[in-house]
Amino acid sequence: MIFVLDVGNTNAVLGVFEEGELRQHWRMETDRHKTEDEYGMLVKQLLEHEGLSFEDVKGIIVSSVVPPIMFALERMCEKYFKIKPLVVGPGIKTGLNIKYENPREVGADRIVNAVAGIHLYGSPLIIVDFGTATTYCYINEEKHYMGGVITPGIMISAEALYSRAAKLPRIEITKPGSVIGKNTVSAMQSGILYGYVGQVEGIVKRMKEEAKQEPKVIATGGLAKLISEESNVIDIVDPFLTLKGLYMLYERNANLQHEKGE
């Protein structure tokens, strides 16, 4: 059984794969202040709830865009699982040809998504990941990672309205009853949702025009389903794209180590 861990700025998503299939997954808040023991006890409870234990896990891979949290997570893996985790970063074999000016600037989550997207859906491809930031990644027909777009995430936009406008409340991100809001909350919900749908459609349209291609558009992340239901440019929603990519990278690198006799 392989344990995969995707750490974002707001949430961390954990999963366990068995024989190539995602058996279970969990989502928890990213907490930069938790210790290795606190993370260990939390993961222990999650596993035990599914009838699993640390001993069932034979390998671990971690992707993180939050560097301060990595020490605690690596120590947790070594202390409780007795396994040194594979970390997505320099030295890991991704198989990606990255055309960024500085490939090291490409976030681990974007690399993992690209690996999974190419394997599952082919190319050319646009991957939209609705996280703390919303990222758009373009992979051309030759399976080269060409770059993309980064925008503030939906929750950041909603929180900015709440924190910077004294009379506007904090809202739930959900579809309002109508585009034309009849009260402050529904007007804000309409602005956030349909404003974001417009952003997605506009950026995807411009990316396609610049690439002179008609790539398939894959959406992932917590709010992908909500946005896709209102948009006409998203072809597939894959909520577990990142976890699948982590598993693929683990298998690829574990096989390479085995071939080298490590």
Curated annotation (Swiss-Prot):
- Where are the coiled-coil regions? none
> How is this protein annotated for GO cellular component?
cytoplasm
The annotated active site, in chain numbering, is D109
Q: In which pathway does it act?
A: Cofactor biosynthesis; coenzyme A biosynthesis; CoA from (R)-pantothenate: step 1/5
- Residues reported to bind ATP: D6, V7, G8, N9, T10, N11, A12, V13, T132
Keywords annotated in UniProt:
ATP-binding, Coenzyme A biosynthesis, Cytoplasm, Kinase, Metal-binding, Nucleotide-binding, Potassium, Transferase
Q: What is its main location?
A: cytoplasm
What EC number(s) are associated with this protein in UniProt? 2.7.1.33
This protein's cofactor list reads: NH4(+); K(+)
Put simply, this protein is called Type III pantothenate kinase
